[in-house]
Amino acid sequence: MGTALVQHGGCCLLCLSLLLLGCWAELGSGLEFPGAEGQWTRFPKWNACCESEMSFQLKTRSARGLVLYFDDEGFCDFLELILTRGGRLQLSFSIFCAEPATLLADTPVNDGAWHSVRIRRQFRNTTLYIDRAEAKWVEVKSKRRDMTVFSGLFVGGLPPELRAAALKLTLASVREREPFKGWIRDVRVNSSQALPVDGSEVKLDEEPPNSGGGSPCEAGDEGDGGVCLNGGVCSVVDDQAVCDCSRTGFRGKDCSQEDNNVEGLAHLMMGDQGKSKEDNNVEGLAHLMMGDQGKEEYIATFKGSEYFCYDLSQNPIQSSSDEITLSFKTLQRNGLMLHTGKSADYVNLALKNGAVSLVINLGSGAFEALVEPVNGKFNDNAWHDVKVTRNLRQHSGIGHAMVNKLHCSVTISVDGILTTTGYTQEDYTMLGSDDFFYVGGSPSTADLPGSPVSNNFMGCLKEVVYKNNDVRLELSRLAKQGDPKMKIHGVVAFKCENVATLDPITFETPESFISLPKWNAKKTGSISFDFRTTEPNGLILFSHGKPRHQKDAKHPQMIKVDFFAIEMLDGHLYLLLDMGSGTIKIKALQKKVNDGEWYHVDFQRDGRSGTISVNTLRTPYTAPGESEILDLDDELYLGGLPENKAGLVFPTEVWTALLNYGYVGCIRDLFIDGQSKDIRQMAEIQSTAGVKPSCSRETAKPCLSNPCKNNGMCRDGWNRYVCDCSGTGYLGRSCEREATVLSYDGSMFMKIQLPVVMHTEAEDVSLRFRSQRAYGILMATTSRDSADTLRLELDAGRVKLTVNLDCIRINCNSSKGPETLFAGYNLNDNEWHTVRVVRRGKSLKLTVDDQQAMTGQMAGDHTRLEFHNIETGIITERRYLSSVPSNFIGHLQSLTFNGMAYIDLCKNGDIDYCELNARFGFRNIIADPVTFKTKSSYVALATLQAYTSMHLFFQFKTTSLDGLILYNSGDGNDFIVVELVKGYLHYVFDLGNGANLIKGSSNKPLNDNQWHNVMISRDTSNLHTVKIDTKITTQITAGARNLDLKSDLYIGGVAKETYKSLPKLVHAKEGFQGCLASVDLNGRLPDLISDALFCNGQIERGCEGPSTTCQEDSCSNQGVCLQQWDGFSCDCSMTSFSGPLCNDPGTTYIFSKGGGQITHKWPPNDRPSTRADRLAIGFSTVQKEAVLVRVDSSSGLGDYLELHIHQGKIGVKFNVGTDDIAIEESNAIINDGKYHVVRFTRSGGNATLQVDSWPVIERYPAGNNDNERLAIARQRIPYRLGRVVDEWLLDKGRQLTIFNSQATIIIGGKEQGQPFQGQLSGLYYNGLKVLNMAAENDANIAIVGNVRLVGEVPSSMTTESTATAMQSEMSTSIMETTTTLATSTARRGKPPTKEPISQTTDDILVASAECPSDDEDIDPCEPSSGGLANPTRVGGREPYPGSAEVIRESSSTTGMVVGIVAAAALCILILLYAMYKYRNRDEGSYHVDESRNYISNSAQSNGAVVKEKQPSSAKSANKNKKNKDKEYYV
């Protein structure tokens, strides 16, 4: 079989018991290291961290080898002492992963003499002393000075399993070191003698007799193979070389004589039983010859329940030297082969995990040895021979008065491989037994003293013989011959038959399991099995007893059960046991056991005490309380639990049962009370799904094929893949099935009412949610009888986990109170987020999405969570709640609690204890909508609590441009306002150091009769956030951090008289008209009607919206329908018609023969400059040549626009600073006397022209378009300098875009020499209806020649409709961002009914390259854009030409421009100054100190550059009044 390894365990190796310390010292024994592969010895850990030393004596002739080694098990720190470089000692060590420090001794020590070696550790320094002649030290350059030590102190070599596990060795090169060859003795740590713990291939021997230091086995000429030839194995017995030739085919002292008749050991008889033990001529096994080749062999077959029992009571054994021989053949890994003795006087020989185990106790403690083959196992269905000898020896002590001591050497041999394993205690040399000799098994193998296994042998045993100086017991022969003292239990065949193997099975899924009969183990019992898996969790065995009620004086009845379980959690194996007086939970092994290797588990119990062992490591336990009876009444479940668990009671301590963790992996060799269980056959009988009758491990990793769909996370399991679908929104083995979504509107819930009350100590919870609210309950467990809860909720945009385990129903001291954890930020972003909670006892872990997990440890007296319900959306069980969390508005998905996907189980009807009114499917949530029917309607609520932070959320829907949505005032100047201004949302506030305005970001006005979501928040660091639908605006304010509000909170508006006293940054002059819903005030969900302190106006529940809506034909003649809350209106601007539906004739003038003219002149201080123009007019004529309308700029500028008829076709010419640009409809003849409508728009150099319903004619200048040229120009020079910039661009040859300083509109063409003759109607130009103004005798209109008004001026209703349309047109037309002049502030006071047209004109906005800068800016603008606006793109859409953009100009403009053109240098200076002054201005929000005169400074806050000399700020108010009429280019 090759070289064998001998491992030693228990508390005794080479006299290893602490009781033997004197034995080893008195004997003067050392450790002999033969230098064999696999040789090692381990001493207890030397804590060499700081100041410590160890010493030993060494004797060798070897030039290299590993002397000692220890480390921190694979991290940083280690210390190594080796022989190298001609037999010199070299020491290396490292601390904290520093560069290893090394020193090399000067003196060789491989001279065959004893040398004293001492190692002294002193923080970063280590000193090596050799004898008294040499001392060298070395220091490591480490940031840390203390060395960390985890491993034992290995001397002479390293265990093979440690060499194979490279990650467990800090110094990888130590694996390649040769083993030490020589002797080591007197190992001391800090002057105290150290005893070895275990080892292999190392012999305990006295000082070698030959002064040369060589072993007797090394004799012979140089170059020989030693004393033993032909592969014989040499060992030292009584200082003599003994050769074992049994496996060589040779015999003789040195295995030199060929002998083909040599056979195995079991059938050989002793040639001379009386031969003296003192005979120095004792040889090895090779001298044993067959006495009779035809002798009958005595063989028996054992199948797990059979055994022999020889009664020793008549003739007790009392021996000091004895021998046991037998042969075995089996496929089973574990089983008892032979046992005799009881209590502390016994011999046990067994097969343990495929190795031969020997345990001997003569009264001084157990001595154990384990023999394993190098390759494979002994359970290979081949014959193997075992021989055990125990000899009494006399040994000489050194340095003590008693020089002669007796001790016993124990030798075990398997297949002729002889190994001296050590000595028993000298004070106990006699084996005494008056009990029984058990062969092949026993009635209760687990209860035998020292038994390492719990099951009987399965296989064949041959020639089992025990002999000592006085007796020879051929046990196999006696059994077959029916000796009266030999009892045979079971049916034994006295021949070798094939024994059916216990085939392994594989549990392929967590749901698979096998039911075993009830385990009757009231007083004693044993279970053993092998398992193999790579999965971290799983319930392997479980059974419980009858439920019983445990009652104390304080609390209601509690259900308790006896139970037994073995489970895996996080790769560790646990034993759980409760016999009615308390639960024990034992970790069977400190290392993880899910590495895919086979592990043998052996559980044995006797009353309250017992052991659980994994492989060779045994852990004892003692159950608490007085009970010794384990009363199991239910079936014993293997691998998992049935799906229907209604009849089962799960103790809280069995976490895998409550977490639904079934075992996935292999099980084999299950023995219960020593009886084998054919689990493969049981699985077939029960037709269990997911159980396979074999065990193999697939080499390919399943996750390499990416089996998890929809971004599921894959983990390799045991021959399977495991998908984590928790963050995907899908379910199923491969995340292939979309998970159900539940929608909650704040009044909806889902409640799982569990059939029985649950008690758990471990939970796995995961869910996905999506919400725009910063507050709301996501999930909670609730109890009807206690305050216990595990609750997840949104709290200020974070996920808050609350776990409360109270003492109401637990006999404990007062509970500590709830534990809380927070994770995530800004989770109310209407995006899906995944939450995971893992609790294991007192350990908590909370994870949101892929962020770092938050962990915590619970305090308190217990870990049991009680609950009857799992609730979502609303908590209905509120009896023990001190405060009720806010209801949830949003969506939930994939709620999984301990493996149960409750939302989908509820939807599919798989559970019948589900109650809900939440709606399945993803739905838009509009919660509690309320309609404010009029602009004077509002409600008052309790004061908004937003002192340190704030989270507001609401939804609105309106068609109104303006309106106050929310207002709350406070102490001093503190206030908060949310309002709509020109369709855009403003958030205005004052924390005490001045008012601030933040404009919400949106691509278009929000008064589009669609629902919009608004979130406004302020955190403790004064970060303000405004989110409208998906667009976010943020700003940090300095100074005061608290919002101290005092008065009522007004929603929808305020009292009429209050508008006058609102802060200046607030535009609102009326309330909000439309719908509000889902109002969330810092976590409070008010009912706007029932919770109102008082209501005003018409407020109704629900939201029906406008009674009439815009249709395709709502407005005639291409009028534009504008949706209003109480109906709609028509914009008739570009139609030439009037009336509510654009079907009434517009104001019409007839120009008779001889010609006439209507002229409109702008006041000198009010002349507009525009980048875009819109012109529409209706006419009828038969003329081929005529001018209809002409617009001219101020004298000297030359800009113009002319609408004319040429050769019966309509066309337009214009010039805005360079060449004339013309556009014409060449396909339409319009001088046919019929009524035609022409529409013209211009944007820069681009223009469109349409006649009636003919296709629109578009004109774009050749080359780069104006917009591109404008963008290039504005990259370098902004348009703030107006005409100055135009002149600069003209010099550079670039196309201009501004129609400067418009002075007159001439209608009729008389001055141009081409008078128009015919009818003109409904003229519209950039917001002016000039013919209407002429009919109303406007002061700026002059009429000359043959011009006659037809009919009457449109009625007042028509005028109002027109005004409404004009106002709406100005607010909805697509234009550049603009800024209002300071002059509009003065004009705002004009009565609106007196001059409606003028008012509309005054509302025309000044074109600007930047966002607004004062509190009156009411135009759409991207806040915080930080750059120049694109003149042709607003809100991401390409506009059509024609938005009116107006710049006012004074009468002195012309002269000033001429002067500036002449002084180019002065222009450059002004340009640089303007760019420097305004380039870094914040455009997204505005702060105003209201203590100052804002109106007087508003012009300069526009960022305007004045074409005239600016008046000093120190001038009088009269000068300020005058300066308001200056022209500004913005």
UniProtKB/Swiss-Prot annotation:
Post-translational modification: O-glycosylated; contains heparan sulfate. Heparan sulfate attachment is required for synapse development by mediating interactions with neuroligins and LRRTM2.
Single Gene Ontology MF annotation: acetylcholine receptor binding
Sequence positions that bind Ca(2+) 3: 1199, 1216, 1298, 1300
SMART domains, per database record: 4.1m, EGF, LamG
Residues reported in the UniProt entry to bind Ca(2+) 1: 345, 362, 430
Signal peptide: 1-30
Annotated Ca(2+) 2 binding sites: 788, 805, 864
Annotated tissue distribution: Brain (neuronal synapse).
Domain Laminin G-like: 31-217, 299-496, 503-695, 741-914, 928-1103, 1149-1347
Region named Disordered: 196-219, 1412-1443, 1497-1530
Location of the region described as Interaction with CASK in the Swiss-Prot/TrEMBL record: 1497-1523
Cellular component aspect of the GO annotation: cell projection; cell surface; endoplasmic reticulum; GABA-ergic synapse; glutamatergic synapse; neuronal cell body; nuclear membrane; plasma membrane
Pfam families: EGF (PF00008), Laminin_G_2 (PF02210)
Cystine pairs: 228-243, 245-255, 460-496, 666-695, 703-714, 708-723, 725-735, 906-914, 1075-1103, 1110-1121, 1115-1130, 1132-1142
Residues of this chain annotated as glycosylated in UniProt: 125, 190, 813, 1246, 1408
Ranges per topology, Extracellular: 31-1454
Domain called EGF-like: residue spans: 213-255, 699-736, 1106-1143
Gene Ontology biological-process annotations: adult behavior; chemical synaptic transmission; circadian rhythm; gephyrin clustering involved in postsynaptic density assembly; learning; negative regulation of gene expression; neuroligin clustering involved in postsynaptic membrane assembly; neuromuscular process controlling balance
The entry's keywords: Calcium, Cell adhesion, Cell membrane, Cell projection, Disulfide bond, EGF-like domain, Glycoprotein, Heparan sulfate, Membrane, Metal-binding, Proteoglycan, Repeat, Signal, Synapse, Transmembrane, Transmembrane helix
Subcellular location(s) of the protein: Presynaptic cell membrane
Keyword Magnesium appears in the UniProt entry: no
Spans through the membrane: 1455-1475
Cytoplasmic side, ranges: 1476-1530
Main location class: membrane
Role: Cell surface protein involved in cell-cell-interactions, exocytosis of secretory granules and regulation of signal transmission. Function is isoform-specific. Alpha-type isoforms have a long N-terminus with six laminin G-like domains and play an important role in synaptic signal transmission. Alpha-type isoforms play a role in the regulation of calcium channel activity and Ca(2+)-triggered neurotransmitter release at synapses and at neuromuscular junctions. They play an important role in Ca(2+)-triggered exocytosis of secretory granules in pituitary gland.
Protein name (record): Neurexin-1
Species, as recorded: Rattus norvegicus
Record gene name: Nrxn1
